[in-house]
């Protein structure tokens, strides 16, 4: 697990918007999305509900805490 991915997840959880979080992290939205997907695969859980609006799942909230 990369420390960078953990930090990116914290920022994304704060903004709940990939574009805004990516901009604040000085990276691209596709790159951020890839890192979060890799983190989810590594943990074996879904951290975010990607529907009309981005939301943390119960596992995502627990992981953030």
Predicted regions and their residues:
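Residue cluster at the C-terminal edge of the helix-turn-helix DNA-binding motif
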Residues: 15, 24, 37-46
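Short helix-boundary/capping micro-motifs
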Residues: 10-26, 53
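The N-cap/first-turn positions of alpha helices
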Residues: 2-8, 29, 60
């Amino acid at each position: 697990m990369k420390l960078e991915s953990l930090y990116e997840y914290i920022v994304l959880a704060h903004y709940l918007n990939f574009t805004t979080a990516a901009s604040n992290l000085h990276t691209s939205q596709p790159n951020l999305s890839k890192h979060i997907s890799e983190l989810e695969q590594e943990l074996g859980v879904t951290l975010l509900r990607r529907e009309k609006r981005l939301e943390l799942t119960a596992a995502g909230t627990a992981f953030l805490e």
